[in-house]
Amino acid sequence: MATLIYRRTMQVHMDKLDEAMRITTEQAKIFKELTGKDELVSFQVGGNPRTICRQRMVEMDKLGEDDSKVSADPKWQELEKQHKGVFVDGTMVDEMRYVINMPE
């Protein structure tokens, strides 16, 4: 079974990093509650510290299942609305990376 690292990075408006961290860590908790899987939240050290990255491991054959669960959740939807004014529009970058050394 193929494993992917799914990563989403977004830029944060000046003076909004604390709010961005609050929103994304709440979303990570909801993701864990609904899927039983971890989502890691980080920000960059050095370079541009005003970016937030959410990262999770997913099985390729179940790629859309987790997203369907969380996107239907009312708490998740409310947090998505809070992105406006916190995250910079048009800066979202999604990346999927195939894991080549997944432990068995």
Name each model-derived stretch.
Residues 92-104:
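Short, low-order "capping/linker" segments at domain edges
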Residues 25-41, 57-94:
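An amphipathic, aromatic/His-enriched active-site/gating alpha helix that lines ligand/cofactor pockets
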Residues 3-11, 53:
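Active-site-flanking beta-strand signature of metal-NTP-handling nucleotidyl enzymes
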Residues 1-2, 46, 59:
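Short hydrophobic/aromatic segments of transmembrane alpha-helices and their interfaces
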Residues 47-51:
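Short acidic/glycine-enriched loop/turn segments that link adjacent beta-strands
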Residues 11-22:
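Short, surface-exposed ligand-recognition loops at beta-strand->loop->(often short) alpha-helix junctions
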Residues 12-14, 58-62, 100-102:
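Non-catalytic surface loops within mature trypsin-like serine protease
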Residues 41-42, 52:
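N-terminal secretory/targeting leader peptides
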